[in-house]
């Protein structure tokens, strides 16, 4: 009897602790989490896995080389030393590191996933989250910059280099924080019942947050570009009533429309399916989301390869700089800024703004002349004051 009464507190104490304290599984293997979530963990390389890995590595190499070419082109060509191109270079840097992150993923996926620890698995996913967030944030920053320049009737913003650096620092700070959140606590290691099926160590709540965050960013970009298109269309219609160049105005509007469709279309095609799949993973347990996971991962990876094409290769001078770099030729623009460098615009910027900028000034002058008044345009300077003795006689 005495022995029984002595041993009972020893047995009841662990039961009380287990019922009230969350149980964490930091020392468990990756296979433990995959088995609980029902996600298949391969033991050997099959044909499909080899094809996916080969295609993924090829895309990664193209991503890194293409974005490296963009960064070098912006560095060597002094005519690209403007805020919009600095943001494009930062976008290329984000996509370059995305290629590295995907490259690391390709060599630590499939059967190699079994060798990962909890920390290395979180690192693998955190690198992807960081670079993806930086890339999406750069796309948003470029959309905001284009919105400002169009509405101010400028080819380049007058934002100082210091402010550009601040924007870039904010982008990467936010990206690093977003990528590190699961590693510092927002995971399911201590909440095993709420683990995701697609990412077995990630919490369902984090994946919902991350998907909604990116979808909201997408909506903001849609609104910005729609506002730009509506504004340019309105100005173009106004100019067509006062100028003799309606075809040029129509071409300007259509060029902007094509650019918006390409930008938004690439984002929708590459990102929306994967983001919706993350939401279905949480909200639709009966949906077989794992069957489409690798396909949508490659699709999202292609976005980093398409960004240099959309934002850079459509620029004629950027294309010329590419050819000069690849052919090891020296350009006149690499030696220093030219006198008219501030007025030289990329074909992308010029297509959107040049016709609006020049023709709208002529329309404004015609209107003010009809009213008999004189107004200064935004880019014009007031006439110098007359000196004594130089007035009219």
Curated annotation (Swiss-Prot):
Residues 369-381 have a biased composition (Basic and acidic residues). The keyword Metal-binding does not apply. GO terms for molecular function: lysophosphatidic acid receptor activity. CDD domains: 7tmA_LPAR1_Edg2. The modification Phosphoserine is found at residue 341. One of its GO terms (biological process) is positive regulation of MAPK cascade. Disulfide bonds join 24-190, 188-195, 284-287. N-glycosylated. Residues 1-50, 108-121, 185-204, 281-294 are extracellular. GO terms for cellular component: cell surface; endosome; plasma membrane. The chain crosses the membrane at residues 51-75, 84-107, 122-144, 164-184, 205-225, 256-280, 295-315. The keyword Glycoprotein applies. Gene3D superfamilies: Rhodopsin 7-helix transmembrane proteins. It is found in: Cell surface; Cell membrane; Endosome. The modification Phosphothreonine is found at residue 351. Receptor for lysophosphatidic acid (LPA). Plays a role in the reorganization of the actin cytoskeleton, cell migration, differentiation and proliferation, and thereby contributes to the responses to tissue damage and infectious agents. Activates downstream signaling cascades via the G(i)/G(o), G(12)/G(13), and G(q) families of heteromeric G proteins. Signaling inhibits adenylyl cyclase activity and decreases cellular cAMP levels. Signaling triggers an increase of cytoplasmic Ca(2+) levels. Interacts with RALA and GRK2. Interacts with GNAQ and GNA13. Interacts with CD14; the interaction is enhanced by exposure to bacterial lipopolysaccharide (LPS). Belongs to the G-protein coupled receptor 1 family. This is Lysophosphatidic acid receptor 1. It comes from Ovis aries.
């Amino acid at each position: 009897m005495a022995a029984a009464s002595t041993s009972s507190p020893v047995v009841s104490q662990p039961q009380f602790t287990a019922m009230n304290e969350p149980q964490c599984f930091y020392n468990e293997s990756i296979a433990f989490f995959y088995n609980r979530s029902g996600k298949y963990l391969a033991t050997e390389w099959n044909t499909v896995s080899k094809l996916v890995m080969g295609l993924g590595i090829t895309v990664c190499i193209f991503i890194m080389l293409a974005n490296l070419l963009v960064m070098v082109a912006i560095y060597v060509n002094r005519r690209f030393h403007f805020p919009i191109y600095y943001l494009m270079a930062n976008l290329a840097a984000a996509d370059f590191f995305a290629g590295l992150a995907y490259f690391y993923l390709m060599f630590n996926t499939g059967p190699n996933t079994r060798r990962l620890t909890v920390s290395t698995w979180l690192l693998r996913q955190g690198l992807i989250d960081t670079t993806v967030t930086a890339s999406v944030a750069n796309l948003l920053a470029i959309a905001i910059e284009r919105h400002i320049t169009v509405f101010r009737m400028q080819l380049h913003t007058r934002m100082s280099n210091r402010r550009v650096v601040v924007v870039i620092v904010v982008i990467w700070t936010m990206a690093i924080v977003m990528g590190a959140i699961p590693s510092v606590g927002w995971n399911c290691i201590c909440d095993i019942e709420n683990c995701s099926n697609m990412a077995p160590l990630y919490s369902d709540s984090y994946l919902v947050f991350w998907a909604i965050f990116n979808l909201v960013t997408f909506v903001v970009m849609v609104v910005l570009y729609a506002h730009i298109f509506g504004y340019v269309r309105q100005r173009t219609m106004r100019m067509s009533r006062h100028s003799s160049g309606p075809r040029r105005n129509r071409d300007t509007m259509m060029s902007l429309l094509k650019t918006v469709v390409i930008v938004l279309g690439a984002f929708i095609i590459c990102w929306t399916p994967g983001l919706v799949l993350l939401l279905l993973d949480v909200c639709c347990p009966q949906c077989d989301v794992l069957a489409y996971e690798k396909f949508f991962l490659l699709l999202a990876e292609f976005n980093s390869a398409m960004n240099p094409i959309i934002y850079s290769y459509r620029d004629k001078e950027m294309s010329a700089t590419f050819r000069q770099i690849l052919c090891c030729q020296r350009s006149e623009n690499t030696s220093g800024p030219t006198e008219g460098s501030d007025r030289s615009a990329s074909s992308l910027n010029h297509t959107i703004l040049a016709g609006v900028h020049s023709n709208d000034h002529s329309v404004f002058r015609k209107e003010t002349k009809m009213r008999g008044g004189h107004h200064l345009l935004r880019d014009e300077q007031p006439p110098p004051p007359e000196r004594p003795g130089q007035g009219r006689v």
